[in-house]
Amino acid sequence: MIPEKPNDVIWTDDQWKSIYAKGQDTLVAAAAGSGKTAVLVERIIQRILRDEIDVDRLLVVTFTNLSAREMKHRVEKRIQKASLEDPSNTHLKNQRVKIHQAQISTLHSFCLKLIQQHYDVLDIDPNFRTSSEAENILLLEQTIDEVLEKYYAELNPAFIDLSEQLSSDRSDERLRQIIKSVYYFAVANPQPEQWLKSLVSPYKDNQAQDEFLELLMNLAKVFMNTALENLNKSFDLYSELAGCDKQLEVIEDERAFIARAMEGGILNTELISKHSFISRFPSATKKIKEANDGNLELLESAKAYYDDYKGAVEKVQQDYFSRSAEDLKADMAKLAPRVEVLSQITRDVIDTFSKKKRSRNILDFSDYEHFALKILMNEDGTPTDLAKHYRNGFDEILVDEYQDTNRVQEQILSCIKRGDETDGNLFMVGDVKQSIYKFRQADPSLFIEKYSRFSHDGTTGMRIDLSQNFRSRPEVLSTTNYLFKHMMDESVGEIIYDEAAQLYYGAPFDDKPHPLNLNVMVEDKESELTGTEQEAEYIANQVEEIMNHREVYDMGTGSYRKPSYKDIVILERGYNRSRELQQAFKNRDIPFHVNSKEGYFEQTEVRLVLSFLRTVDNPLQDIYLVGLMRSVIYQFTEDELARIRVTSPNDDYFYQSIQHYLKTKEADPDLVAKLQDFLKDLKFYQEFSLEHPVYQLIDRFYNNRLVIQYFSGMIGGKGRRANLYGLYNKAIEFENSSFRGLFQFIRFIDELIDRGKDFGEENVVGPNDDVVRMMTIHASKGLEFPFVIYSGLSKSFNRSDLYKPVILNQKYGMGMTYFDVEKDFAFPSLASVTLRAITEKEMISEEMRLMYVALTRAKEQLFLVGRVKAEKELDKMLNTAISNNMLPMSYRLEVKNPLQLIYAILAKYQANHLTNDLKFERNIDELDDAIHPYAEIHIDEYSDIAQDIHQNEDEEFRTVNDIVNYQSTNTERQQAIETQLDYQYPYQKDVVKPTKQSVSELKRQLETEETGTSYERVRQYQLGASTYERPKFMRQHKKRKANEIGTLMHTVMQHLPFKEERMTSAELDEYIDGLIEKNIIEDDAKPDIRMDEVMNFIKSDLYLEIAQSDQIMREMPFVVNQSKVDHQMNDDEDVSIIQGMIDLIYRKDNQYYFVDYKTDTFNQRRGVSDEELGEQLKARYKIQMYYYRSALETILQKEVKGYLYFFKFGTLSLEETEKH
């Protein structure tokens, strides 16, 4: 009996009911922001206080360990508070002790406790341990190896066919991946063996095939009905237009086809699969356009409807019935043996894997659940005596996040709960609209089934809807309601978004409007930025807009405050665009944090070490061997690698080519020496790896080759160093497993990469750090932010799983494509087509739920961001917005991204601008407040945005001196600041001096010191007076400046071919055009290239000498310790690192030369000879050339000669230049 609710309590009626309802199983459908955690904690407290239940007689199951700890802490605090208020209450005193034994944990923790207490039932050693991730991955791989080896030895015909279908000529990796997928699906089922055995049924059973066919027919009919509607609309519009007889004739033929294909409401799949369209639909000629001058929009709409008709039919042809129903069924029997053998292989894997784990005395998380189920359930599905014991031990079982439960977990709960649904003691809370973990085998259908069965009066189990939202403004809620009322139902979305599912306003905000902003950016094709980079700038612009023009409402004080960066979150489906966002925010000095370790294995330094490890393990892997040789560690050039390969082009492996090259008489002695050093290194590491663990091999490589030091000196050095140490630590963790050896470690890493698991630099940002955060929607679940920017709406849904040769589904089993081994050709089968269609529907349903989670994180305002290449892409979405009804099911099943759903719904705002045939059924203003959308749609050209940014920066631009010389009106504060700033740091000289300096900077430093000027003063002056170069996408096209032309000329020289026969003017012109085609230089750059000066260089002796040289290296970067090249440095001076870039180095007759191109312009004064001018020019660059020469000689350990080439003067040899 639910107690009467007092007037002064804070709980809503539904919350009150959720706290006190009992006597039956109860499902609380708690919408986002409805206070479900508070309700769950209050229910636990009231069961303890009011019903005097001991806290250890409650089983509370949470989704994460963190949630369990937080909930236990909250319950403990409430018990302590109640005990202090009633110190004589013995029951409460006991609870303060029993809370430490309370079962408030994840289900895995509960299962582990069961196993520890009843290991004897399982016949396992009580000293078992949980396997590490590495151990579990490698043991499963080893198991699959052994099982497949057995099948390869037996050569079963069905297995041979399966292997032919799922393996390539070089690898059976795809077969292995599919076995793993089937394994993971099986163990997410309460009875894996039975589920695996059932997979073959649809391939043998006609009744099961008919059920598949019915599912497929129903989906196909959706698209055929849509096709018919669109064809009729096209016909009606063309009928109103003049001169469209040919179009109407084609449409009449298609209407006849549709009539035959859908006759009697039954699809003629034979006819559909063979139907072909006219190759070219009659176009709207000039005569037709003139005849319909006032109705051109209708003419376009008529053609658009025909295109939509054609698209819907082609969807049925391509995805459902590319072959007739009979042909699809015919191949099912042929596939049965392959499905059966795949099922048996997986059962063998489960059995062998289990034995291996038992021999090592280890369990994994899947074992937790299945062993617990074995303790609680007999083989016939009835509860064991131990299960009955636990039923009596728990007065109530409370489950948080019930929508994320899988069927194994559901079975465990069923074994220990009391009674049926009508008189049970199971309390479940969750929100199926936030079920976003299907990839972890979460099964939202469990929630949906109960939601449909249970009733508000509790006669079939109690269902309570918590719909009042205490987080968000009404504009956020009503617009979210409006969106999902038009996209989510049972057919796509898996639940009806009705009044019970809607969000209702419950937070005490003021009445100030905060409409949702749907911002669609149209890409600028002329911009040098990619579309992703443009969108990142667009998002950064939105953040600035929030910071400058929005406020945050404080509910406690009823007043507004300025926003902080931490009030803003950027939500995306994944982290793949995080780098572009980081750069855009860095450009604007906005603090930004990405809470992700994704992309770790793609980092340069990690890829280098993995290439090293793979090469040491097996040098017959060309990609890794060549990658290691080309790396900064060994520095083989492309030219050297090509020479090695050319010597023996028919070798299977590059390693063999190396061996052959070393035996070639014409081999370059320097390259031979370099190769011998490399092979010596490789042999050392191979021998070392045989006697030492992997982490010691990595450590030795790091130390011998100064890997840590090198990458620490690069941009982002701290993160790179952390990544390198992360790999080292992973190797230590691997060593603690029962596996050993380099091969096994590489296998472990490969599996992590395949699973998309990353481990990188730990960079934790606390909740109070004032930064804009970027996170995935999954990571944001349970969190809230004043401002949410939900971006990446144009990113396509991941449909890759739909095109795999084997598709899996917990309910419908396995869909395998038919592969004709003799014809080497794959055909869709009835099962593969049906499961692809079902999986596609489930995938889009989950994407909708992800959208719901994203939208409901916002408290103040939502900003949705998408992008299109051209505004016309929005037209099709707009054509869908024809009424206030649900979006057509066919449209929802075909959408490629969230924008196509959201824009199609919110575009109803543009009703007044649509053509006559697209008017809405009723006015949007007539809608109820709960689903009335408050939104603004902005379609912005990126070129306009870039121009706005440009203008704003011009208005607000300040030099560093402007800021330094700013006069404050707050004298007291100014004095306090000046007191702090007046402190004289004793080592100021070393602060001014940078740790890393370019050669050009050193040249300026030494030149100013020679003239008696303080370098520090010069540097400060340059800093204060300079402004930063504006990015190219913000600049209007102007005539290039001298420095830009210099850069352009260097780019041309960087790629210039060197040929002994010299290039002609025509060939040079063709070469420049090639650079433009490859986007190496800009389209409009050609007029600024001084072609005559380049030709003069080609005609020079220097060009010919380079062309005839033995080796050429271009744009050679270097980093060297200053003390190695500057012998005048004192011992007590702090050392800088010098970095630079040499235009070209060539080697001839074992002598190295470098060339530095100069585009200086100068006037030769009267009376000054060429020799005198040459000396003046050499003097101008003597410092820079000194450092170039010294750096190269330090690196090469050989004497180096150099040339300056002035395009306005010619070649100057530095051989006579005095060394300083």
Swiss-Prot record:
The keyword DNA repair applies. Its EC number is 3.1.-.-, 5.6.2.4. Residues 9-473 form the UvrD-like helicase ATP-binding domain. One of its GO terms (cellular component) is DNA helicase complex. It comes from Staphylococcus carnosus (strain TM300). Its cofactor is Mg(2+). Heterodimer of AddA and AddB/RexB. PROSITE patterns: UVRD_HELICASE_ATP_BIND (PS51198), UVRD_HELICASE_CTER (PS51217). GO terms for biological process: double-strand break repair via homologous recombination. GO terms for molecular function: 3'-5' DNA helicase activity; 3'-5' exonuclease activity; ATP binding; ATP hydrolysis activity; double-stranded DNA binding. ATP binds at residues 30-37. This is ATP-dependent helicase/nuclease subunit A. Keywords: ATP-binding, DNA damage, DNA repair, DNA-binding, Exonuclease, Helicase, Hydrolase, Isomerase, Nuclease, Nucleotide-binding. InterPro entries: AddA (IPR014152), DNA_helicase_UvrD-like_C (IPR014017), DNA_helicase_UvrD/REP (IPR000212), P-loop_NTPase (IPR027417), PDDEXK-like_dom_sf (IPR011604), PDDEXK_AddAB-type (IPR038726), Restrct_endonuc-II-like (IPR011335), UvrD-like_ATP-bd (IPR014016). Pfam families: PDDEXK_1, UvrD-helicase, UvrD_C. The gene is addA. Residues 474-782 form the UvrD-like helicase C-terminal domain. CDD domains: DEXQc_UvrD. Disulfide bonds: none annotated. It comes from the Bacteria.
